[in-house]
Amino acid sequence: MSTPSFSPRTATVERTTAETDVSVALTLDGDGSYDVDTGVGFFDHMLSLFAKHGALDLEVRCDGDLEVDDHHTVEDVAIGLGRALDDALGDKAHIARYGHAYVPMDDALARAVVDLSGRSYCHLEASFERNQVGGLSTELVEHVWRSVADHARCNLHLTVLRGHNAHHKIEALFKAAARALRTAVRRRADHAEVASTKGTLA
């Protein structure tokens, strides 16, 4: 049996509305490099460490209506990220499909489980002691991951198991999601062409 030749998995998504102008460029088989500017400092930090811990290359630009609030910017970037993940994965041949990770961050401990099934679902269990961290409304953390799951067409179960510092809890969550995804997207020649008895993960 011949060994499959793996081509680079990249995607660029651009999205323009009356509220935001977003560009997301993604390389799944990267080295964790990033260049992120959304105008929301803490969100930039989370996306940057998502790239680093996910071993993917990520460029994000967003010019949003931050004079209103951070909602439109954060939502539209998450939509772009989800679409880029879906586009880059292509037919999902030879991927592991599933991934999970636990990540501690001082007082916080988070768990992420992902299935690149082609079906959208997100369940997040977390509470935060502050309404905002570094310009990011904490109520949007769940919205970020729901938007990613919807547009990447994947199944995400995310849990903050313990902690009391909102910054640490959110950071542990993003790192856990990144590391779970890193496992799920990994390609190996000895993996089934498509990891499903249906023959497709579309």
UniProtKB/Swiss-Prot annotation:
SUPFAM superfamilies: Ribosomal protein S5 domain 2-like. GO terms for biological process: L-histidine biosynthetic process. It catalyses: D-erythro-1-(imidazol-4-yl)glycerol 3-phosphate = 3-(imidazol-4-yl)-2-oxopropyl phosphate + H2O. It is an enzyme of class 4 (lyase). One of its GO terms (cellular component) is cytoplasm. Pathway: Amino-acid biosynthesis; L-histidine biosynthesis; L-histidine from 5-phospho-alpha-D-ribose 1-diphosphate: step 6/9. This is Imidazoleglycerol-phosphate dehydratase. The gene is hisB.
